[in-house]
Every structure is written in structure tokens, then in C-alpha cells.
Amino acid sequence: MGDVEIPPLVKQIVRGLRGLAFLATILATSFMAASHERAIFPFDYKADYTDLMLFKAFLGANIAASLYSFFFVCLPPKSLLWRLAIVLDVIMFGLLVAMDSAAIAAAYLHKHGDSQAFWPPICSQVPTYCYRVILAISIGFGGVFMFLLIIIISISVILNPLLV
């Protein structure tokens, strides 16, 4: 089997989706890194994304995905690294889904708490922190969606000659 010929419009769409994935992941990283707030009443409390390892992992996954997306947006079209793109896209997609899902679970605990674990809700004391965390996770899911579209388009281009 020879190389699959990819139409120029599809290449432009995928490159645009990679650019959007870069923007979404870098914005999610920025909002998560900026999420910190201090509450004085009823007790002195400083909420920061570094308080939970899940949020650090979310930040790391989005940094990795944004660097990966930027690298592939800047990659020349004739490069042999494009052959690895679909495999790396699936890996990045899985990493982002896992970290975004874990981060949303932690954000849920921040919002509602867990009475059995004696984890009180903190979003009423530090609302700006919670808003930034939820915004970062929501934008991160936008990056997940971009990677999903890239994977669907790439697989359809690869399978199209086999199905016709």
C-alpha cells in the first residue's frame, strides 16, 4: 500500500484544528496557573491550584498538549513525523481526557465538599478561585474536543481509500 493522498482542504482543516487545540490548551494552562485566592473570613485560607496534585497534573497535561500542538502546527508538510501524528494525537487525547476528568472531579469536591471525608466545600469562601478552575477545565475540554475532531478526520482520511 502506498501513501494516502490527503486533499489540501483537509490538511488546512486539520492544521486549523491543531491551532485551536493549541489555543484551548494554552488558555486552560493559563487560567489554571492563575487560579489562587485568599479568604480571611471565617479563617485564614489560601486556595491555590498547587494544593491538589490533580490540578498540577491537569496543568502538566495541558502544557504537554499545547507544546505538541504548536510543534505540529509549525511542522513542514513534507516531514516524515506526520506519519506518527495519528498515534500521538490518540495519546494526547487520552491524556487530556484523563486529566480533565480528574480535575472536574476535584472541582466538584471544591464546590460541594464531602461530608463523609470531612471535606468542606470551599467555593463559597473563594469564588474567584473556583470560577477560574472551572473555566480552565471547561476550556481544557474544548482542547479535548479539538483533538477528537482531528482523530476522526485523520482516521476517515486513512480509511477512505479502503472503503471505496
UniProtKB/Swiss-Prot annotation:
Transmembrane helix found in the keyword field: yes
Residue numbers on the Extracellular membrane side: 37-56, 105-132
Matching InterPro entries: CASP/CASPL, CASP_dom
Cytoplasmic side: 1-15, 78-83, 154-164
Keywords: Cell membrane, Membrane, Transmembrane, Transmembrane helix
CC terms in the record's Gene Ontology section: plasma membrane
Chief localization: membrane
Membrane topology of the entry: Multi-pass membrane protein
Subcellular location: Cell membrane
Membrane-spanning segments: 16-36, 57-77, 84-104, 133-153
Keyword Repeat among UniProt keywords: no
Assembly information from the UniProt record: Homodimer and heterodimers.
NCBIfam families named among the record's database cross-references: A_tha_TIGR01569
Family statement: Belongs to the Casparian strip membrane proteins (CASP) family.
Protein name: CASP-like protein 1C1
